[in-house]
């Protein structure tokens, strides 16, 4: 009996040792299995710090090693090529541009020679191979990289710290209690008063690149502007994040965002932008994604209605020869209505909800696109159209890796005002409640399925609005879905710039209201903004005003006092017109 117990204990020790060794090897990819066979390799100490260092070093090395070698072509020359009918900045509401957005048109307008395409495809493939090789971190490893659970992330630094200050106050005003991380770029470190004294009171903290990423990899990348966003998402401590641009204001409580069906189904929520998608066929070739030229699957964002409802070449296919149908799909159907492509509209990255564990590789590939964005991928994905930058790299990465995502189907709304009769000043994109949108989308799917015969008939009067957005994607009573975000990116809430650019002042010097849709988001948003700026920077004793680096050389100057007078005057005007703006009776 004693001998049997000893044998059992010895066996348990051996099994435990083997499990421990295998665990070490899974965490440290650089430890070869040959260690098990007698080679003397020193096993690194298992710490989160070592794991992070290994991760960032390997990631940056893979990005640097797979740099595209060719020079990016001149877009103006590409767009001037024979047969290119490129329509710059086709808006979501524009019609009559199907041929301009077709496979043939976008192919001719971004016609890379085969050698360059193959070169780009090779380095892209090598990088994605690294994602399934050296960077193939297990779920426990990914979770170990990010110590936090759930929270909100924004990018600060410079004037963006000032914008984040007001944005965070609005978050708390809605009742959102999720923790917040403000990512401070390397060149903007030193926001001590904001980061150490004010932010913790609002359950927030600053995250510095230099505290997370080893200095060598960080200097190798030389990140600027748009590239900082995706890297900021990666270095955030949260496993699941709501990302908000610093000028993007939530008008609904976000605490339950991670408990929604849409998020649990996909792990990545995106919102539509103002512009149609113009990514060329060359991009799909580079990422190794095939396009079925003969298969249309949507009409912009309507992928619920049968194609026969809006395309006579499908509903009456027998009336056309195979050659006529092929020409139709190649020359007259928007490329991004075809199977295998990213859906229209283009994406707007001022707000995103991301499961970083599930979409770990999506973020890493998006970083690759952003590092080489200025030289290649920004111009390739957006072809120089308005809003070019990081915004479409997230959906592009998810698409390239065949990862699930949900882009809100409901089109944004605009808020703004007419400065003069024909001079409309758009101030903000109003983005909708993503879970309401997803549930309505599922409901619409069931409605179409239950009435498939009727929906399959060709409707010569079909439009995206009357056939989908204003019929299938609205509440039962016909009302619009809720607004969730006010992305006020045009006149940013930077009091210094607003004053110097004379914003919210009419052509004759009169005060004007800019935000005209308080009924859509249930509050006087403009009054909230100006009230907060006035109290925070003017009526508060100067000794207690947060010492933002951005304001260092501006406080205690005559212009600062003039700025405060500007804010006070506009607050007084907004208060005097508040009831009228909210539709209240005196």
From Swiss-Prot:
First-tier enzyme category under EC: transferase
Glycoprotein recorded as keyword: yes
Gene Ontology cellular component terms for the protein in this record: Golgi apparatus
Entry comment on modification after translation: Glycosylated.
Location (main, coarse): Golgi
GO molecular function: alpha-1,2-mannosyltransferase activity
Entries under SUPFAM superfamilies matching the protein: Nucleotide-diphospho-sugar transferases
Keywords: Glycoprotein, Glycosyltransferase, Golgi apparatus, Signal, Transferase
Pfam families the record matches: Mannosyl_trans3
Signal peptide positions on this chain: 1-29
Annotated localization: Golgi apparatus, cis-Golgi network
Sugar-modified residues: 113, 136, 259, 264
GO biological process, one term: mannan biosynthetic process
Endoplasmic reticulum recorded as keyword: no
EC number, as in UniProt: 2.4.1.-
Pathway: Protein modification; protein glycosylation
Family (UniProt): Belongs to the MNN1/MNT family.
Job description of the protein: Responsible for addition of first and second mannose residues to the outer chain of core N-linked polysaccharides and to O-linked mannotriose. Implicated in late Golgi modifications.
PANTHER family, A to Z: ALPHA-1,2-MANNOSYLTRANSFERASE MNN2, ALPHA-1,2-MANNOSYLTRANSFERASE MNN5
Full protein name: Alpha-1,2-mannosyltransferase MNN5
Gene source species: Saccharomyces cerevisiae (strain YJM789)
Source taxonomy: Eukaryota, Fungi, Dikarya, Ascomycota, Saccharomycotina
